[in-house]
Amino acid sequence: MMTRKLLIALAVTLAATSAAHAADAFPRLGTYAIASPHNYYDADYQKQLAKVNVSILNIYPGWGTGQKTTMDATVKKIKAINPNTHVFAYVIGESLQIPATSAWVDFESTVNSSNWWLYGTGLDTSKVLSDFGKAYYILNITTQAKKNSSGKNFAQWFGDYAAAQFGNPNPSLDGIYTDNVFWKPRRDGDWNMDGKIDSQNDPTVQAWYRAGYRQYVDTLRKDMPGKLQLANVADWGQSNAVLTEYKGAFNGGVLEHIIGSSWSVEGQGWAVMMAHYRKAMDALAAPKYAIFEQFGSATDYQGMRYGLASCLMDDAYYAFNNSAHQNYGVDWFDEYDAKLGAAVSKPQTAAWQQGVYRRDFENGIVLVNPKGNGQREVTLEGDFFKIKGTQDPKVNDGSTVRKVTLKDRDGIILLRAKPVKRPAPPAAITTTASN
C-alpha cells in the first residue's frame, strides 16, 4: 500500500511540475504599452508587440474609428505574427477624469446619474480627488455603493460595461486588464453613503473595497467566459496587505515599477522586493501572467540585467519601461534572445554561493547579486558560456567561464554546453503493490 501511495504521489508531482513548465519558455517577456500614441494599428508597432509573451494595450470607446479598424482586427494581426502571444485590453474603474474626454462622456454621465463617485460626506458634490491628482476623481467601487434601477452597484455595472464595450466586441483579446486594483482604498470618504467619513485604514472599509473588486471581476468572468482577467497588483506584496477577497480572483497582473523608480519597493532592499514579488504571485490564479516591470534608462545594462535576473528567480514576465518613452514600445536587449527554455529548479528563496542567488534552466543558469552584497566571485561546477551580445560586450562577450565576478546589484545569464531536460511524468501508475 505504501509503495502505491509513493508512486501516485510521485506521478502527481511530476505531472504537475511538467504542466507548470509546459507554458512559455524563459525569459518570459511582457509590455505595459498603455501610453500615447495608441497606434497599435501601425505594422511596425505590431511587430514589436508580437515579440513578447504578454501585452497590455490601452483602448477607449471609438478607438480605431479614424483608421477604419478595430482592436479585434489589430490583435488578429499581432497574433498572425506570433500565435502564442497574449493581448489584454486596459480599463480602469478606480477613478475618472473630470471633465471627461469625449470618449468617456457617456461613461461620466452614467456615473453622475447613479451617484457612483466617492463623496466627502453623503450625496453632495464634494467628490474626492484621487491621489494621482490631475483632475481624476475616485469612483465608489465598494459593495456599499448605491444601486441603480437595475439593482446593480458600480462594481457590477462596470464589469458589464467593460465586457460589453471592450471584451466581447474583440474576441481575439485574451481578456481584460484592470488598473489600480489596490488592496485598500487610498482616500477617506463616505464609502457607505451614511453621511460620515470612512477611514481608508478601517479594516471594514478595506474589506468593502476588495469585495467590490471581487464583484467586478466575478461579473467580468460571467460576461466573458473562457477569458482571463488581469489587474494592477503593484501593492499586493506589501507586508500588511490583506488579499483574502483577491486570492485566485485574477489570472495575472502588473507589478508596476517594482524596481527602478524612486518609489519602487526595491528601495526597501532586495529581500523585501522579492518577498513582495512572491506574495503577489501567490495570490494569482493560473496561468499567473504576472508582469515584473522595471523602470529606467535603456542604456543602463547592468541595471537591466539586475532586474531581469531578479525576475527570473520566480516565474513572472519581465517588462522594461524605458524612461525616455514611458509605457510605449518594446525595447529589446541582448538577454532577451537567450533561449533558457523551461526552469529545472523551483523559484529561489535562498542564496546559492557568496550571497549570490541562482536558478537553473534547461539551457542555462541565471545569477543575481543583491544590492548591498558587494562584488562577488562565484565558482561554477563546469563550463558555461556568456551570451554574445553587442550592447554590453565587456560582459556578454561569448566567453567560456568557470568563474564569474558580479558587481554589486548585478545579474547575468549563462548558457550551458549541453541542455538539461526535465524528466517526463510516468506514463502509467502501478497500483498492484500492497506493502
Where are these regions (language model features)?
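Gram-negative bacterial Sec-dependent N-terminal signal peptides
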Residues: M2-A20
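Intrinsically disordered, low-complexity segments enriched in polar/charged small residues
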Residues: A9-L10, A33, A427
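Glycan-processing catalytic domains of CAZymes
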Residues: A22-V420
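Intrinsically disordered, low-complexity proline-rich regions
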Residues: R422-P426
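Intrinsically disordered, low-complexity segments enriched in small/polar and acidic residues
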Residues: A427-A433
